[in-house]
């Protein structure tokens, strides 16, 4: 089945270039150039992944990202001409999985897309992994606390499972970027990891300000806390 990519960008020349790149990879592209129309186009097109510009006429990409996240956990990659911390963090906190600054090389965009589309979490033989008082059903991609199901995005699930599968190992942010996002080059922005850990903690920790399940290792990164099996 052909992968469908929704490209939301008011720069029509850039969108056309992205469409050509997507076509060479065998992906189908759907385009939207105005923020006010983006959510309707999303609902009508039912894409597998969204490329979403931050700066759009009518409604900005951060607000659109929040709208999409109310109904879907599909991968969202923000496109931004700004490297400003506030814009990057706002997009990630709104629910974006990744971001790529303009201008970008086509091969870098393709690599980011493939990393987000790649199903990694169900690799391996185990069906359930325990992490603190959480039970992770690997095959079903579900997380439970007792009988309560905790809704995570696929990326949040991957992050939690990666930590749970290597109990007591302290992962550097760079290691997590390679493991979860597929980045294999130096000088990558580690804010991606920090923001997604915050989002994950908000969902799984009973007290996110004093986390017990995903712990910070000062000067290193993050590790699983509690009993993991």
Label each region the model flagged:
Residues 45-51, 56:
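Active-site beta3 strand of CheY-like receiver
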Residues 66, 70, 75-130, 202:
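Basic, amphipathic DNA-recognition helix from helix-turn-helix-like DNA-binding domains
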Residues 142, 147-154, 158-212, 218-220:
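Positively charged, aromatic-enriched patches within helix-turn-helix-type DNA-binding elements
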Residues 26-34, 41:
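Short hydrophobic/Thr-rich beta-strand motif most characteristic of the beta2 strand and flanking loop
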Residues 31, 56-59, 85, 93:
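Residue-level signal for the "D+5" position in two-component response regulator receiver
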Residues 46-48, 71-76, 186-187:
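His-Asp phosphorelay/catalytic-motif detector in bacterial-type signaling
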Residues 16-24:
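Charged docking surfaces used in two-component/phosphorelay signaling
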Residues 34-37, 60-63:
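Acidic catalytic/metal-coordinating carboxylates
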């Amino acid at each position: 089945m052909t992968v469908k990519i929704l490209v939301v960008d008011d720069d029509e020349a850039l969108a056309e270039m992205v469409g050509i790149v997507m076509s060479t990879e065998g992906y189908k592209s759907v385009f939207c150039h105005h923020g006010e129309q983006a959510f309707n186009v999303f609902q009508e097109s039912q894409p597998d992944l969204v490329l979403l510009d931050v700066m759009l006429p009518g409604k900005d990409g951060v607000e659109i990202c929040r709208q999409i996240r109310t109904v879907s956990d599909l991968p969202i990659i923000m496109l931004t001409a700004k490297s400003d911390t506030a814009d990057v963090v706002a997009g990630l906190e709104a629910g974006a999985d990744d971001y790529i600054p303009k201008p970008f090389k086509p091969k870098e965009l393709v690599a980011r897309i493939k990393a987000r589309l790649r199903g990694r979490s169900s690799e391996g033989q185990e069906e359930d992994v325990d992490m603190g008082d959480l039970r992770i059903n690997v095959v079903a991609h579900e997380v439970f606390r007792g009988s309560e199901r905790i809704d995570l995005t696929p990326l949040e699930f991957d992050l939690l499972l990666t930590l749970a599968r290597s109990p007591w190992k302290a992962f550097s942010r760079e290691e997590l970027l390679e493991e979860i996002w597929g980045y294999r080059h130096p000088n990558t922005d580690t804010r991606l990891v920090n923001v997604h850990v915050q989002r994950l903690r908000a969902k799984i920790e009973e007290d996110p300000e004093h986390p017990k399940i995903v712990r910070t290792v000062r000067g290193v990164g993050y590790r699983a806390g509690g009993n993991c099996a």
